């Protein structure tokens, strides 16, 4: 069973383009990504799954606990080699997300977490996901909420992001490709992270960003708090229950008719 808590430190470098397990300094971002895999893994149970843009591979391996088959796809050759060596349950392939190297109607689920904001042609990619899904297949996608991730900006703060989305824009992108959006959810800080926000001047995120921008040593308390974050510290809440525009990350569950 995949367990990043017990994994050796990743052999892949931390570039800012992807998160990796096993690093105390990266743990907040890793857990914020991992929670969506954990909470939505049941949608992959017994199914043929493509993770389009699998990165380090920890998520594809987590999905492999329940799926019939997991295909991982990434454009970076070093990443593909890493996943092949580290996660043998994942059928890892090298390829471009703009032209998915799979036949039409060949998988039941496409997973795309924290990737679409890196792509230049998002509409082309979403159309490709529609193509490779079987009728009734599910597209699971997560992405930073533009409203809270890059507030008041026309361009993303993260230099690796090409275009960030708000909830309405994500829904429009999916529906234009032919998907029916079953649900939209938001990732929020739970009670424990709200306490850490208060401890670190109102935002544990901003505290980490300021340290990185200043290229300053880690404050001992900040590092300890970041290293202690767990997936249970995040809430994944339907848009019907909480204002989606206040969320940290957006999660959409879309179905190919």
Swiss-Prot record:
Gene Ontology MF terms: S-adenosylmethionine-dependent methyltransferase activity
E.C. number: 2.1.1.-
Keyword check for Electron transport: no
The keyword Kinase belongs to this UniProt entry's keyword annotation: no
SUPFAM superfamilies the record matches: S-adenosyl-L-methionine-dependent methyltransferases
GO biological process: methylation
Keyword entries, A-Z: Methyltransferase, S-adenosyl-L-methionine, Transferase
InterPro entries according to UniProt: Methyltransf_11, Methyltransf_Superfamily, SAM-dependent_MTases_sf
Pfam families from the UniProt entry: Methyltransf_11
Role this protein plays: Probable S-adenosylmethionine-dependent methyltransferase required for the 6-O-methylation of the polysaccharide backbone of 6-O-methylglucosyl lipopolysaccharides (MGLP).
Similarity-based family: Belongs to the methyltransferase superfamily.
PANTHER family referenced in this protein's UniProt entry, alphabetically: METHYLTRANSFERASE
Stated name of the protein: Probable S-adenosylmethionine-dependent methyltransferase MSMEG_2350/MSMEI_2290
Organism: Mycolicibacterium smegmatis (strain ATCC 700084 / mc(2)155)
């Amino acid at each position: 069973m995949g367990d990043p808590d017990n994994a050796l430190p990743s052999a892949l470098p931390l570039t800012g383009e992807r998160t990796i397990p096993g690093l105390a300094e990266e743990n907040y971002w890793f857990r914020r990504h991992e929670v969506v895999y954990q909470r939505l893994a049941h949608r992959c149970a017994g199914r043929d799954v493509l993770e389009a843009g699998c990165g380090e591979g920890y998520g594809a391996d987590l999905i492999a606990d329940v799926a019939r088959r997991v295909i991982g796809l990434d454009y970076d050759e070093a990443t593909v080699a890493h996943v092949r060596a580290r996660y043998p349950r994942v059928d890892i392939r090298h390829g471009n997300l703009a032209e998915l190297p799979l036949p039409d109607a060949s998988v039941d689920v496409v997973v795309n977490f924290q990737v679409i904001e890196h792509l230049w042609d998002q509409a082309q990619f979403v159309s490709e996901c529609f193509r490779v899904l079987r009728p009734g297949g599910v597209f699971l996608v997560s992405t930073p909420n533009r409203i809270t991730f890059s507030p008041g900006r026309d361009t993303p703060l993260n230099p690796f992001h090409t275009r960030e989305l708000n909830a309405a824009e994500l829904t429009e992108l999916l529906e234009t490709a032919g998907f029916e959006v079953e649900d939209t959810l938001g990732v929020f800080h739970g009670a424990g992270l709200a306490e850490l926000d208060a401890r670190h001047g109102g935002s544990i995120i901003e505290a980490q960003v300021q340290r990185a921008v200043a290229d300053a040593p880690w404050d001992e308390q900040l590092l300890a708090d970041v290293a202690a974050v767990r997936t249970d510290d995040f809430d994944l809440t339907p848009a019907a229950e909480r204002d989606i525009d206040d969320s940290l990350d957006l999660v959409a569950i879309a179905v190919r008719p």
